[in-house]
Amino acid sequence: MTRYFFDVVGHGRSELDYTGRILPTPERAYDAAELMAFDLAVKQEDATIGWAVNVSNVEGHKLFSIPVQESYLAAA
C-alpha cells in the first residue's frame, strides 16, 4: 500500500493535500483522481474548468495529472 497525494491546481491557485490517501495501486489512485476531477466539474462547473488534479507519491514526485474538463459535464 502506498500513500498518494491529490493536489488541485489551476488559475494560479493550489489546494494542496497534506494528508493523502493510502491506496493499493497507482491505478486506484488514478481512478480516485478521475472521480475528483469529475466531482469538481459537476459541483463547481465553470470555476474549475482548466484546473487539474495532480497525483504525487510520498517523495513528492508527480505521477500523473487529471484535467478538470467540460466533457465531464456532458456525462453528468
Feature locations, PLM:
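A short, exposed loop/beta-hairpin motif centered on an aromatic-Gly-Thr core
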Residues: E15-P26
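Short aromatic-glycine-(Arg/Gly/Cys) micro-motifs in beta-strand/loop hairpins
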Residues: M1-L16
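Intrinsically disordered, low-complexity segments enriched in small/polar residues
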Residues: T2-Y4, R28, E70
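A generic structural signal for short beta-strands and their flanking turns/coil linkers
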Residues: T2-Y4, T19, E34, I49-W51
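A short, charged, amphipathic alpha-helix used as a generic interaction element across diverse proteins
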Residues: T25-E45
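Short, mixed-charge low-complexity intrinsically disordered segments
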Residues: V42-A76
